[in-house]
Amino acid sequence: SYLRAYHDGKAIGGEVNYSTLDCNLLDYKLRYKIKGDKAEIYKTEILKEYPFPQYTGERFCPEALVFNRIALKYKLRHINAKIYYCEYLPDGLTAKIVKVRMDCVQASLAYYRELYQMDIPYTQKVKTAINYCRFALCAPCDKWKLFFKYPQLGIIVYPIAICLHVRDLARVTE
C-alpha cells in the first residue's frame, strides 16, 4: 500500500515514520496505529480468492471486511510514498458512512462480528463490540438476540451502543 494525500500534499491520516513496512493490514491499522485511507494494491488472483459478499437488499459492503479476511493470510508491503491525490466530498461516502452502515446492516454486522473474533487489542475489541451492537439496533430482526452474542461485554457495551444509536438516528434525520 502507498499513501493517499490531499491535493496540497498533506498525507491523509498523517505522515508515517517508515520507508517500507511489511505487515498485514490489521497490524498496520491496529498495532502500529497508522490512520487514514491508503492506496492498497492487491494481486487480482488474491481478490478473486476473497470476493465481496453480497447481501439481499444491500448495496454496500465495507472494503475492510474483505481486506481483513485477506490480512489473515497475506501481508502487504507498505511504502512511504504518496501516489494517490484526492479530496473528500462533503456529501460523499465518508461523510455518509454511518447512514450507509445503518442501511446495509448485514454487511456492517458481518464486518464487526469478524473483526471481533480476530486477534486484535482489547480496547479495539470493546469498540468493535460497541459498534456491532450499535448497528444491530438497525437490523430488521430480534435485536436483543443479536446483542447477546457477546454477553461478557454487555454491561459496558449495551448502554454505549444504545446512546450511539440514538445519536445516529438524530443525525441521520437532521
Language-model regions, residue ranges each:
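Generic structural signal for hydrophobic core residues of well-folded globular domains
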Residues: 74, 115, 136-140
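Structural register within alpha-helical repeat arrays
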Residues: 125-135
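Preference for long, solvent-exposed alpha-helical segments and helix-linker "stalks"
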Residues: 78, 98-102, 128
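Conserved nucleotide-sugar donor-binding catalytic segment
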Residues: 4-95
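Catalytic core of nucleotide-sugar-dependent glycosyltransferases
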Residues: 71, 84-89, 96-122
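Membrane-interface aromatic/basic loop that binds lipid-linked glycans or pyrophosphate carriers
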Residues: 137-174
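Alpha-helix N-cap/helix-initiation sites
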Residues: 60, 123-126
